[in-house]
């Protein structure tokens, strides 16, 4: 099997700065990490490879410094890493990003073999749109399985895959054909510890680097800010909410009285909650 995992190097959310003119994230000088959701996707891909054989190619789009995240992915056990980097990609929204990544995945298929599965995290912590994975699937005409918690089985003979998809109030069990694209949920698979051999191999490995032309992109106007119709009107930090702690003396009060006092206090601050609970009780009756 050939599996492609799309990861993204994201800024530490606690130290994000926003450009005052373009309303894009300023990454210079901000510590970066691999998008946490992408690590769950990477671990699931590695588990599939370990069980069924094949190789895992990790792909990211970003500035040259994103090579650091790719080497980290190699230490976890990925077989190959490709960096899609070009000044033309700067300022890409989800539409332009999914276009560039889909073109690169098509090039990967031509160079290293068509992927059977493309994995992504469900979303990134810097954008939180959850649009790039489905956008890639649409452009590559792949079946998309989103918000997947677990890959339960793969039948290479029939080219079928079964997954568990987390849904409100339960779990969906879905069966699909390969190839497909899967977006992984958080908490599904904790990333493994890389071995010493993998760490040494990662340090020696060459990171494949493609610019827009090398990735097979012919229309540069679909990349970067020029290819991004999304307009961010305003970016701001929410006003911190005041938090208070209330201490209730229970020495001389019965527990039921304490509970009633707490409920009354909560409803006083959140009247909508009282109405919602009253409606729920009426329906249940």
Swiss-Prot record:
Coiled coil: none annotated. Transmembrane segments: none annotated. Keywords: Electron transport, Nitrogen fixation, Plasmid, Transport. It comes from the Bacteria. PROSITE patterns: ETF_BETA. SUPFAM superfamilies: Adenine nucleotide alpha hydrolases-like. This is Protein FixA. FixA and FixB form a heterodimer. GO terms for biological process: nitrogen fixation. Belongs to the ETF beta-subunit/FixA family. May play a role in a redox process involved in nitrogen fixation. It holds the Pfam family ETF. Gene3D superfamilies: HUPs (3.40.50.620). GO terms for molecular function: electron transfer activity.
